[in-house]
Amino acid sequence: RQGETSRYLAARNDLYASVMIAQAILESDSGQSTLSQKPSYNFFGIKGDYNGQSVTLPTWEDDGKGNPYYIDAAFRSYGSVENSLQDYVDFLEGSYYVGVHRSNTKNYKDATAALTGVYATDTTYGDKLNSIIEQYQLTIYDTY
């Protein structure tokens, strides 16, 4: 649903739309998670608060060795889909995520590898994103 919006935002921010869409699919359970629903609209599982707004929900984490554990965490609450999408690209602007930018990668797989263990604690995060990108042929959104 958000393919063209993702293409536009990714193009303007040196990102891969395919990765952006795959992250939204994975992090929001294809838009079915409580976090991705109204009023939070957090499609990317970004923790913390947005303009002082957050919601606390249970989530699985990975200890970096493939061992999952369960915690309650505060996640950003956006109030609109547009705010969620824009905050995602703003979130990836920092030097911490320089490895996901198109100008620093050969392809989307380099970007998903750079997210693994950094954006998410899941040690198989990049593999999961790659599978989603391939399954739904999301690279069509990487052309501008």
Task: List where the protein language model places each region.
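Catalytic cores of secreted/periplasmic lytic hydrolases that degrade extracellular macromolecules
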Residues: 1-144
